[in-house]
């Protein structure tokens, strides 16, 4: 299913369906969210991640963390994945043998977007045309940092090496992007659950 040069991205609705935590750690992490809605969305996103990964590898799902906190499959290190969610919609990106990062943001009013861009974006992002443009660039930049494994810890400069970033259609009120190590991939979009 995962061919070289492809990244598969699943759109996952987080607003319906019952889920239970798979591990004690997952339950403890979910409990830290401030509202029942946020806890349920977290659990649904991680349940979908497990189902999706079990569909691309027959190895048991044994998760571990890289030194900067990016999760990976210790049981199938050739499978690379990333998860992002915003306001009831998640994206799960999966690739083989290349690092991958994904980000999604619901487009919403954000009066301080220019100050945020100035603080976090690398030089050259001074020409934003509005909040929609800000979120397009934000998701591209965040996906790149997540693929690299640095997240906002690495903000202020693009990660070293060759990376490709592709925008993903997540719906009219969202901006989304996927980033991979190396050449621009063929992005294959899937629905999951009610998004199917």
Each model region followed by its residue ranges:
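Core catalytic alpha/beta fold that binds nucleotide/phospho-ligands
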Residues: 1-196
């Amino acid at each position: 299913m995962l061919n070289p040069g492809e990244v598969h991205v699943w759109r996952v609705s987080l607003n319906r369906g019952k889920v239970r935590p798979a591990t004690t750690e997952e339950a403890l992490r979910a409990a830290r969210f401030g509202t029942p809605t946020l806890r349920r969305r977290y659990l649904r996103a991680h349940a979908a991640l497990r189902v999706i990964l079990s569909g691309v590898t027959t190895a048991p799902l044994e998760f571990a963390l890289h030194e900067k906190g990016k999760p990976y499959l210790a049981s199938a290190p050739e499978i690379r994945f990333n998860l992002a969610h915003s306001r009831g919609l998640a994206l799960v990106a999966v690739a083989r043998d290349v690092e991958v990062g994904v980000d999604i943001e619901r487009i919403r009013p954000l009066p301080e977007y220019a100050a945020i861009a100035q603080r976090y974006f690398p030089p050259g992002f001074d020409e934003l045309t509005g909040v929609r443009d800000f979120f397009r660039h934000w998701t591209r930049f965040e996906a790149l940092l997540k693929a690299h494994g640095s997240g906002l810890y690495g903000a202020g400069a693009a990660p070293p090496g060759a990376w490709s970033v592709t925008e993903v259609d997540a719906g009219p009120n969202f901006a989304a992007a996927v980033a991979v190590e190396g050449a621009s991939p063929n992005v294959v979009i899937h629905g999951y659950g009610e998004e199917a």
